[in-house]
Amino acid sequence: MVSENLMTVVMLPLLALMTIAGYYVLIPCEIREQNSRITPRRFIIGFWPFVVSASFVYLLVQSQATIIKFFDIKINSHYTSLIMMIEGDMVAHFQSFATPLLTYFNGFVYLIIFSFIMIFTFLILIFTRNVTALEEFNIAFIIIYLTAFPFYIFFPVTVTGHVLPGVSTLLYNLSPIIDQGVRVVDPFLDNGFPSLHAALSVMAMLIVMFRTNLTRYKAFIVISTIAILFSTIYLGIHWITDLVAGTILALISYYIAVKYRRTILNQPNRILVSIEKKMSIMDQIFCEKCSKQVSIIPHSTHIECPHCGSIQNYHPLTYI
């Protein structure tokens, strides 16, 4: 338990510092100034549904060991053998040039850079008021986790470093703190197919590349995603098949999120509005046409002005 907590204690402050640095380096100055006009209350009202929904799915997936134990699910290891039949020991070549420095660097990429781009992409979409992309990111994130979850329970694939001769689990060997920390989210070290590192990083890259105009961050996330994919193989964790499956899952999730965003969000938005009504959560805005103050339920998306009858679209994160 101490090791698990220590890994979190080390990572969180570092990720916080990187996020602050990224905010000033990767977000244009004019957007930072615009963001300062959002009131804390409106900011919280706007982003809490995204955090709650993504966190719920994440925690569900992390309950893997509990679910397996509760339902007495028998883990079958022959799926790892199937992957070995498909690709052999190709991944072993990636450790033929291993050095301590390269191992530490890839460990940093796998643990820190991956976590950073997931957190920062979410935050940067909020800061840039790109609600459409934020909704697509959230939908794709949930689809990826819910799709991967059954595979991790019923079709486990063990990390390459535990089954291939000549391949070491370089990441876990760096420190028992890392080994214990990783087992919190992957208790049996067999959450291989599909690769979440591949699926989530590629999905985030697609959102940033095609749904934003953040030039500097586009360059950063492309390089980071390539490095993440390489690190998963080099460190003795994933098979190439895992990465291919993860990439395909990212593409499908991105497509569904972009094409069917409005349809998917119809029912959740109704639930949000219902909750806000019951809790009497209201926001005060000014009509764009008559400039009179109007009360609106935050996630109702639009309102008809009672004074002039005009229709005005609204979201807490985009209204100034």
Residue ranges and their predicted role:
Residues M1-T160, V167-G181, N213-I223, A227, ...:
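Terminal transmembrane helix and immediately flanking juxtamembrane interfaces
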Residues L200, L235-G236:
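Short, glycine/acidic-rich beta->alpha junctions
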Residues Y104, D186-F188, T232:
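Short amphipathic alpha-helical segments at helix-loop
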Residues P156, D179, D186-F210:
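Alpha-helical transmembrane segments of helical membrane proteins, especially in multi-pass transport
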